[in-house]
Every structure is written in C-alpha cells, then in structure tokens.
C-alpha cells in the first residue's frame, strides 16, 4: 500500500515537472521583437557596424568619426547631432533617418539611400555622394546647392540619378 502511494506520488510529481518544462520551453519559443539600440552620446570612433541591422536605433550626439557603417540597415535611425566625419556609409540604407545637425564632413555616402531623411541642418562638406539617393530629403538650400556641385551617378538599388533626387538645375 505504501509502495503504491509512493509510485502514485512519483508519477504526479513527474507530470508536474514535465508540464513546467514544457511551459518554459513554450514561453522561450515566443519571439520577442527586436529592440532598437541606444548609442546616444557614445564615443564610437572607428567602430564597425558594417552590414548590421540597426533600424530605429538612436545615435543622438554620438561620435562615429571614421566608423564603418557600410551596407548597414539604418532605416529610421536618429543621428541627430552625431559626428560622422570621414565615416563610411557606402550602400547604407538611411531611409527616413533623422540626420539634423549631423556632420558628414568627408564621409563616404556612395550609393547610400537617404530617401525621406530629415537633414535640414546636416553638414556634408567634402562628402562623396556618388550614386546616393536623396529623394524627398529635407535640406537647406545652400547645402543642396553645395551637393549639386559634386552630385553624379545613379543609385544601383533604387535606379535613381543623384542629381535628379537632389533636384539640381
């Protein structure tokens, strides 16, 4: 009798443990959404973000001088007030990014997509913009004129001419 009671208790305990294990596994299987990263005010000089998916991340006032962001997915990213001097953004997707007051001095924006980005007070002195797509980018008129002086090429992804996307005369 005691032996049967012991076996029954063991069987019930084993079932409870199995249910707990299955529950934990099921909870772990539920996909959690990717959270945007926060790099605000970080010093990221020479950092390598090439090819990374960083959608909706924030680099507000970050120092990304000489960093590699080539072919990165930067859609919706905030680079507000960021230092991107001499950064490599070749082939990066900056669609709908916030670039206001960012410094792209001597940055490589070859074949980058900046469609719909807000870049009103961004600085682009000496930037390479061959094949960059500036469709619907909000720029100051003097910056637009400056970029039109060096604009050339066609973006290989969107098929748009850089000069046309800047609405150059």
Residue ranges and their predicted role:
Residues 2-9, 14-169:
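Tandem repeat scaffolds
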């Amino acid at each position: 009798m005691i032996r049967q009671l012991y076996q029954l208790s063991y069987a019930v305990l084993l079932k409870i443990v199995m249910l707990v294990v299955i529950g934990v596994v099921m909870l772990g299987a539920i996909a959690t959404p990717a959270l945007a990263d926060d790099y605000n005010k970080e010093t990221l000089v020479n950092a390598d973000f090439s090819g990374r998916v960083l959608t909706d991340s924030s680099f507000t006032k970050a120092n990304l001088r000489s960093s590699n962001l080539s072919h990165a997915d930067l859609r919706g990213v905030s680079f507000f007030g960021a230092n991107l001097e001499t950064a490599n953004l070749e082939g990066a997707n900056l669609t709908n990014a916030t670039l206001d007051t960012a410094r792209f001095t001597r940055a490589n924006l070859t074949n980058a997509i900046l469609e719909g980005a807000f870049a009103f007070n961004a600085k682009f002195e000496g930037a390479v913009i061959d094949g960059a797509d500036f469709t619907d980018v909000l720029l100051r008129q003097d910056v637009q004129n400056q970029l039109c002086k060096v604009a050339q090429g066609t973006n290989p992804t969107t098929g748009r001419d850089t000069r046309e996307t800047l609405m150059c005369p």
